[in-house]
């Protein structure tokens, strides 16, 4: 299966999962809006996922997959034994980490959201909810490991589907038990139930793929030692990346309602980021690992350039579209219950600011696996350390004048700086070879985006009353029609300019 086709299949499954995620966020936003309770709930929801990105999806996956592929070249049994050792070690490590976090949760929340400390009830509620949700870390991390195993053998569907379980659990559990216990507690408990179901589901998929492995505790194994040594820089790198979020969150905790606003905005701009960037990044790492192991440089360069072209082709129009339509999108998705029109405006502003960095976020997800596929975990760490300095300074500089928008703008500026460093280091180290035609390719896409934006802006201007109709069906139909017309204009123009060739997917 080609990179593009694999990416499209995974992107489609990610799209479905993100739709369910949006429904879940819509449900939570209608209950809490940007109230203090909403801020506490968003922190409790984010905390385990933040550490998951550091330990599981960040450091572990980037180091585990290349070694697992090496073992698979020897035999399936060798790969399964390696998986068993890593699974056991990860489980025991996470149990210790969760126990420590339960003890030091007040101190942890003080670091993540120092602005809450002056508001005793808000601070105590956040600590209480985080103590309920943090055990989800072990389940979601094991799910990520099992997903990495399946991704290594090009079985991407199960892991892409697993987030749907979380969204469905949160909604159903809260609807059933919301009348008997506090909504904040029912949502927090539903996270743990979802985590258990996700692990069970992934285990079933791994067994069906005949990749079942024994539970082995063996820290002296040379492959496990290699994993742990390589995980050092990778964990720091992933941790530093997440530290960007910690810092942004810490700063925003001093602005009432900003944590909730940024969380709701994050959910919408993460929609294309996950569908495009994460989907292709997930596929790229195992693909790149294999071609580098076989020393096939020509294939590696072809994969790199195809991925960059696809990333540009999809991220640039998404950026233009999101910026123009951020307000009606937010209105349709969130504005109900306690979520006010002012919340809609604030969230839309944050979405537009985040969207400015969308191409950089997506292209970074395409370039970063190039280093990990070569076994280089130190360069991404250096790049991330530089980026975090930019992110922190931008957030502090822009927060006073632009409030929550300043934090989102600072994040986008840091994303472009990060991409610039990734490009610079990868080309200097001869790991990336950009084809000469990509500059013209990018210019043509920008021309297509400009024409698309003009058409969308005109539709928005002349049919504004329908985009904000009191009837949901009319609003959704109008927004959907506008997006479809915009997509048709973009790809139609792209075809005329020979940006895309529908026989080969990308030219």
UniProtKB/Swiss-Prot annotation:
GO cellular component, one term: plasma membrane
Main localization (coarse): membrane
Keyword Ribosomal protein: no
Cross-referenced InterPro entries: Lipid_II_flippase_MurJ/MviN, MurJ
Any one GO molecular function term: lipid-linked peptidoglycan transporter activity
Keywords: Cell inner membrane, Cell membrane, Cell shape, Cell wall biogenesis/degradation, Membrane, Peptidoglycan synthesis, Transmembrane, Transmembrane helix, Transport
GO BP: any one term: cell wall organization
Membrane topology annotation: Multi-pass membrane protein
Record keyword Lipid biosynthesis present: no
Cellular localization per UniProt: Cell inner membrane
Pathway field: Cell wall biogenesis; peptidoglycan biosynthesis
Stretches that traverse the bilayer: 3-23, 54-74, 92-112, 132-152, 156-176, 185-205, 268-288, 310-330, 351-371, 379-399, 405-425, 438-458, 472-492
Function noted in UniProt: Involved in peptidoglycan biosynthesis. Transports lipid-linked peptidoglycan precursors from the inner to the outer leaflet of the cytoplasmic membrane.
Family membership: Belongs to the MurJ/MviN family.
Name of this chain's protein: Probable lipid II flippase MurJ
Lineage: Bacteria, Pseudomonadati, Pseudomonadota, Alphaproteobacteria, Rickettsiales
Encoding gene per record: murJ
